[in-house]
Every structure is written in C-alpha cells, then in structure tokens.
Amino acid sequence: MFKFILKRIALMFPLMIVVSFMTFLLTYITNENPAVTILHAQGTPNVTPELIAETNEKYGFNDPLLIQYKNWLLEAMQFNFGTSYITGDPVAERIGPAFMNTLKLTIISSVMVMITSIILGVVSALKRGKFTDRAIRSVAFFLTALPSYWIASILIIYVSVKLNILPTSGLTGPESYILPVIVITIAYAGIYFRNVRRSMVEQLNEDYVLYLRASGVKSITLMLHVLRNALQVAVSIFCMSIPMIMGGLVVIEYIFAWPGLGQLSLKAILEHDFPVIQAYVLIVAVLFIVFNTLADIINALLNPRLREGAR
C-alpha cells in the first residue's frame, strides 16, 4: 500500500510541472508583446517604445522564456504570484480572501452534493424499475438539464425578492450560503446520483449478494456490505466535486455577487489582468490533481483489488 501511495504522489509532480508551464504561458496567448498587454490593461493612453522597453525590463520579459518560467515557478511555490496589472497590489492579497470565500462555499456544497447523491442513488437502486426509481431519475434529469443561472435567477426572484426570506447577493452571514448551495446541489447532485445508483445496482447483482441472501443474512447486514463496496463512488464524488465545483463557480458567484475566486477571475479576464488569471488557473488545476490523487488512494484503501491492478 505504501508503494502504491508513493507512485500516485510521484505521478502528481510531472502533471503539476506541465500544468504550471501551461499556466505560465497564459501571458503569451495574445499576439502582442506582453508589455503592451500590461500597458493597455493599465489604461496607458500612449504606448511608446520607451514605455515598452521599461515594462519589459521591470517584469523580466527580456530574459529567456525558460528563465522567466523558472523565476515565476519559484515565486508561485511561495504563493507569490506577482502584482496585479490593474491595481498594483500583490496578487496573493487579492486571491487569499477570495479563495477562502470560495473554499467555504465549495466544501459546504460538496457535502450537500454527496449526501443528496448517496440518498437518491441508494433509494433509486433499491426501488429500481418501480415508480420511485422512475420519478427520481426523471426529476434528476430535468433539473440537471436546467442552466444554473436560470435556477439561480428563479430562486432570487421568488425567495429573495418576493418572499424576502434570504439575501439576494453578497456574503453578509450564514444565510447567504443557502441559495448558492441549493443551486450548486441541484446542478451537480443529478449528475453524481446516477453514478451512485449504477454502482449500487452493480453491487446488488454481484454473486456475493445472492450468496448472502441464500444464507439467510439479515437485510440490514446485507445492505451494509453493499454500501461499503459502493462507498468508493461516494468517495470519488466528494474528492472530485471540490475542484470541479470550485472551477465552475464563475457564473454562480457572478449572479450572487459572491466575493470569491470565480468573480475575481472573471473580472481579471475582462481586464486582462494575467497574474490574477494565472493564480486562479494554477490553484484550480493543482486542486484537481491533488483531489484526484486523494480519491485514488482512498479507493485503494477501500478496495485492495485496485492496488493489485496498479502493480
């Protein structure tokens, strides 16, 4: 098991190097000189060759590309992502509070997505082929097909504006989490619930279930065995939903005026503030890699066959 964990962790580093290099290259995705991009982003009215040369020297654009990448990576490893092109403030000071706001919303939403997916998936699998199963799948399919921004808008209109129960936007207290969490749960639970249901149905059709039933094992004991084996899907759901939700919160945060990474990154994209964009992309990408690795390790702990297959 220790070797398996080491292999999975070792695989993270090449991926992170590739991701970090691709993130670094975001500065060069435009056809113009990065210095010109910076000057335009700062609203400089007259971009002269002297200003371009000065900006190139200030930001180290005269260095070879690999040297620039090395310097940028060493700073990023210390959570120093440079300064904002627009405000001149350190990016870490802007990213830090926004990251914590997004992380809190993501964790709460991920827990709700996991709980909802497991409950609906288990009930649907146990009632497969019956009215309850068909009703759950139909409602889940319908809700999943609805755009998140539409659901959010409807909730704001009826719950916040007409009924005046919850705040429409911003982060003013614990009640501010309710509407965004509901929207995120609706958007993702319908997707993950199908995975839980499929895993439960597969386990219920396994030979060991038939054997335990024939042996007269109590239903509750039998169900515990099935749930334990199907738990791997729930673990994967929880681990993978965190970076997926965090990476997909741009629209939700914009609608609810949530002071998080999504809204900050959207503003940075519109302003061509590349250091902020780089920090956002790198953080989300690293979270994807870390939580995917964590899911593999936890699943291997739950299922020894996965460890054998990875040797």
Curated annotation (Swiss-Prot):
Q: Where is the ABC transmembrane type-1 domain?
A: 99-295
A GO BP entry: zinc ion transport
InterPro entries in UniProt: BPD_transp_1_N, CntB, MetI-like, MetI-like_sf
Q: Entry's Gene3D superfamilies? A: MetI-like
Give details on activation and inhibition.
Answer: Nickel/cobalt import is reduced in the presence of zinc.
Q: Which residues cross the membrane?
A: 9-29, 105-125, 139-159, 173-193, 237-257, 274-294
The GO molecular function terms of this record are: transmembrane transporter activity
Q: What SUPFAM superfamilies does the annotation carry?
A: MetI-like
Induction record:
Repressed by zinc.
- State the membrane topology: Multi-pass membrane protein
Q: Which GO terms describe its cellular component?
A: plasma membrane
Following inactivation of the gene, the phenotype reported is: Deletion of the cntABCDF genes decreases nickel and cobalt intracellular levels and decreases virulence.
Domain of life, per UniProt, equals: Bacteria
- What Pfam family is a match, any one? BPD_transp_1_N
Principal localisation: membrane
Task: Identify the keywords attached in UniProt to this record, alphabetized.
Answer: Cell membrane, Cobalt, Cobalt transport, Ion transport, Membrane, Nickel, Nickel transport, Transmembrane, Transmembrane helix, Transport, Zinc, Zinc transport
Signal peptide (from-to):
none
State where the protein is found. Cell membrane
The family classification in the record reads: Belongs to the binding-protein-dependent transport system permease family.
Oligomer and partners: The complex is composed of two ATP-binding proteins (CntD and CntF), two transmembrane proteins (CntB and CntC) and a solute-binding protein (CntA).
Query: According to its UniProt entry, what is the function of this protein?
Result: Part of the ABC transporter complex CntABCDF (Opp1) involved in the uptake of metal in complex with the metallophore staphylopine (StP). Involved in the import of divalent metals ions such as nickel, cobalt and zinc. Probably responsible for the translocation of the substrate across the membrane. Plays a major role in nickel/cobalt import in zinc-depleted conditions. Contributes to virulence. Required for full urease activity in vitro.
Q: What is this protein called?
A: Metal-staphylopine import system permease protein CntB
